[in-house]
């Protein structure tokens, strides 16, 4: 079992931009950050249900396919689920509505909501007020030997990195400069010093960098 992170960031390290609204939950620059990933054949099939074979193939698609492999549970922050915008709506089921793309248990770190939310496709959201380490213990039990993903946002990922809980950190660096937002690397000087590193440039210009605690990338 490994703890994995996969994030899209800009050249200057921003994983989300300012100006988040209920209509644009990830901010106005989200499409620029994730455009290469969303365009892949794997993403279109796994998230949009597009079985036509449309979408890009190549390096970006290989990483998109790897993103979905071997995950048994996930941990995410309240903002990624949408609770910052809908804190008092008991009917809020996340940005994905009735068709979340996870198909495994997800721990949502929050003090705003409790209980569980189950879907017929195997996705379940478990709302818990926990530290990073305690959340990981719960996720490990739910993953049943498979890997655990720390899904985001960047503030949540930083907590896990600062506590040394991440085994594999993959960032897809989009060839754009945002100059604002939430920076993944804030306060993380030398956090990857004990990792090996692998990098690869995709046809889109996206640079995929993976830091790993062992030789498995």
Where are the model-predicted features located?
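Enzymes that bind and transform nitrogen-containing heteroaromatic metabolites
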Residues: 1-217
